[in-house]
């Protein structure tokens, strides 16, 4: 989120956000202590056209992975490298004595986040991550554990080394990537004997959108990143909702 202050006006630009992530509980503190009342909220509205339902939290995904690690010796997770909160959460699901593996690029990103944020939250303390060298893969073969994978030939070769009957591949991304025409993800998911979805939305639910708007108490709400901007009015009936077109300007 960005709080923009200029010429006596205060504008809150939310970007994509959600309250069911690992840090969702601190949102009220941020709104109360750091933001307060604003004149305008420019907010994402990805979910306003969807039916309301309780969003699965990142902590619930972590619990599912713990269960999969008890059921399967080898758990492979396909998720976005930039979804670092999920990588931190799932890495912490791996029990002592088992391996947690990712490639060098993913490990570097995790370390950058840990270096900057671990002093503010223990959640971001550096987890024990290994990169897939021959000795590590031998240990993974013997003890099992969790491996973050990407759709490429390197990980395809690695996955084929392990018994598919003792393996599961968890698809932890937006399903549209998998179902789009000519996607190579279905073929990748077939490398193990079993695959399952393990994902939750990266966007705020309608109730969470309403909650943040009411907290910020703006006079004007401007929806963006939505296929149904007109539905924003039903979420905040006591606010003025302005629907802007691309390149259209609004003077406050």
Model-derived regions: residue spans:
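His/Asp/Glu-rich metal-coordinating catalytic cores
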Residues: 1-85, 89
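Short, glycine-/Ser/Thr-/acidic-enriched flexible segments
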Residues: 9, 17-19, 47-48, 82-83, ...
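Beta-sheet entry/capping signal
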Residues: 10-11, 39-40, 74-75, 97-100, ...
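General beta-strand structural signal in soluble alpha/beta enzymes
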Residues: 13, 42-43, 77, 100-103, ...
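Active-site catalytic pocket residues across diverse enzymes, especially alpha/beta-hydrolases
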Residues: 30-34, 94, 236
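Structural recognition of alpha->loop->beta junctions
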Residues: 33-37, 119-126, 193-195
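Hard-cation-handling environments
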Residues: 50-163, 224
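C-terminal regulatory/interaction regions
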Residues: 95-96, 127-252
């Amino acid at each position: 989120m960005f709080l923009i202050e200029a010429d006596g006006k205060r504008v809150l630009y939310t970007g994509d956000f959600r309250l069911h992530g690992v840090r969702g509980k601190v949102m009220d503190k941020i709104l109360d202590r750091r933001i307060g009342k604003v004149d305008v909220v420019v907010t994402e509205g990805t979910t306003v056209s969807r039916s309301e339902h309780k969003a699965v939290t990142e902590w619930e995904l972590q619990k599912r992975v713990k269960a999969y690690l008890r059921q399967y010796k080898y758990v492979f997770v396909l998720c976005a490298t930039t979804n670092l909160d999920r990588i931190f959460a799932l890495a912490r699901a791996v029990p002592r004595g088992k391996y947690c593996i990712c490639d060098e690029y993913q490990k570097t990103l995790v370390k950058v986040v840990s270096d900057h944020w671990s002093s503010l939250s223990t959640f971001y303390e550096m987890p024990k991550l290994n990169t897939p060298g021959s000795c590590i893969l031998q240990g993974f073969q013997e003890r099992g554990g969790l491996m973050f994978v990407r759709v490429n030939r390197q990980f395809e070769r690695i996955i084929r080394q392990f018994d598919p009957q003792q393996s599961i591949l968890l698809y932890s991304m937006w399903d549209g990537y998998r179902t789009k025409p000519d996607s190579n993800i279905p073929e990748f998911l077939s490398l193990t004997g079993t695959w399952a979805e393990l994902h939750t939305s990266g966007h705020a639910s309608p109730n969470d959108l309403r909650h943040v708007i009411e907290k910020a108490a703006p006079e004007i709400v401007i929806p963006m990143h939505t296929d149904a901007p007109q539905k924003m009015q039903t979420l905040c009936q006591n606010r003025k909702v302005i629907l802007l077109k691309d390149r259209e300007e609004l003077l406050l």
